[in-house]
Amino acid sequence: MAKVIGIDLGTTNSCVAIMDGSQPRVIENAEGARTTPSIVAFTDDERLAGQSAKRQAVTNPENTIFGVKRLIGRRINDEHLEKDKKNLPFEIVDGGNGDAWVKAKGETYSPSQISAFILQKMKETAESYLGEDVTQAVITVPAYFNDAQRQATKDAGKIAGLEVLRIINEPTAAALAYGLDKKETRTIAVYDLGGGTFDVTILEIDDGLFEVKSTNGDTFLGGEDFDMRIVNYLAEEFKKENSVDLTQDKMALQRLKEAAEKAKIELSSASQTEINQPFISMGSNGQPLHMVMKLTRAKLESLVGDLIKASIKPCAAALKDAGLSKGDIDEVVLVGGMTRMPKVIDEVTKFFGKEPHKGVNPDEVVAMGAAIQAGVLQGDVKDVVLLDVTPLSMGIETLGGVFTRLIDRNTTIPTKKSQIFSTADDNQSAVTLRVFQGEREMAADNKILGQFNLEGIPPAPRGVPQIEVTFDIDANGIVSVGAKDKGTGKEQQITIQASGGLSDDDIEAMVREAEENAEADKDRKDLVETRNQAESLVHGTEKSLEEHGEKVDPSTVEAIELALGALKETLETDDTAKIKGGIQNVTEAAMRLGEAIYKAEADKAEAAQDGAPEEEERGVDEDIVDADFEDLDDDRKRG
């Protein structure tokens, strides 16, 4: 049976894992790293993903896309995107349906597409390790992702050629990895501060039963925000000193971002670091400007103190929703790279009143949990039951624009709930159901998930028709809504898609494009490997010809030189088949050179042997079988 893989699709880095026997195993990528940068870049002739995309970001900032998870499932007019638009070197545009898309090399891409390119990279990593095709996956999302964001993540999996068996919340996945072998009953808080999002989840673990009690968070709070605080500080200090605004230079901005991320990481273990960026800009006099600045841990903490405190409020809300106090928490588990920051650890310790658990790798534990869930779905992991919750309330807009909840936040999923509504006007023959998700009292203040009509209602006074509205949330947290006229039996049901979102046709087109690109990528890789093989063969053959050409007849030398010349000509083209043909011709011609070399050596050895005196040969034999040696051996045996 083919393996189901677990993927942590992160804002900054992604990770893939599988079940290896009874334990999850993180798979290293082609570069030997256990996590892969969630970065995609477009050059003139190829698309890059992962470390190769990150390496060229400084020289190609406008076409290098990162942090796309913060865009997924979001509208172009989202207030959170306004500040990001100013700070990002690449362009965020309207996808034509009101969704936020990105632009690179003149083409527009949905966040689901960019995420799909990252998922393809993770898929290839797993396939390379397993030696077989992978078609199914469990993918993680922030617990506080809404329906549109979950659906967009599932779309990304489909575009990448993966059947997404389950969308699982990141803190819940981390809890699975933490509690897999624990038998005693424990109540834990998972504090997950990653590259772009923050979640806190309260769970009860009891001998294989993982029950989520509550979840809270912020899908626009993470390491990217910490980085931008450092970037803005560096840019301001540089502007004060040199009267040059680096934020207007996309290449300089990308260099600052990389320097900020590096400094942030270093300050988790050091009290001070130096940021050194030579030739970062040009002065008004044409002279190059360099950035050399010191950044202390204390200064970093003052820059991001409010961001850290912003993560504590959801912790209090999650405890309240779970009906628990801080003292009821047995263990606090830290997840996400930002939890390595000492100030974050201090604030979490201060709030919960206990030292956090440090027994899990914050960068890998989510992927490991996804692999465990994959094992559960595949039947390889027994006695594990996961009960998750929906993070936000769901309902419909009723008379006066009021948000009427059908399913409250932190309801265990999967779940189904029905409620009877009626018409607002006399003789109303149709109703429009507008579905929202959120916690505000007025529908317009919440996130609209979609809308649909129920038509054919018989004329009747207002309040008489009975319309049953049913909400159904599956284990992925994705919503279906139905409406039924109890009088006529007419009903309408839809799986909610955001008012933007990708249509089935969009997804199919992107799947085809991904498949075509995969074929093109394979062809390009084949060309590069064939070209390398040809160049190596040319070099080796020319060297052999130079050293041993006199040992073969001139016609053989001429044949080899002709074949080499033809192969060099094919190397000027991008025709893989022609290059392979040239390799074959040179190999066959060079074989005669090899045969001649070995024949010449054999003839030389034979001539030397024929010229050796018989007595000398016998003398050598006598020296080998030495009487004294045999006597000594006998003495040892007797001893």
Curated annotation (Swiss-Prot):
Positions of modified residues (Phosphothreonine): 197
Region described as Disordered: 514-554, 603-639
Name of the protein in its database record: Chaperone protein DnaK
Record keywords, A-Z: ATP-binding, Chaperone, Nucleotide-binding, Phosphoprotein, Stress response
UniProt entry tagged with the keyword ATP-binding: yes
PANTHER family, per the entry: HEAT SHOCK PROTEIN 70KDA (PTHR19375)
PROSITE patterns: HSP70_1, HSP70_2, HSP70_3
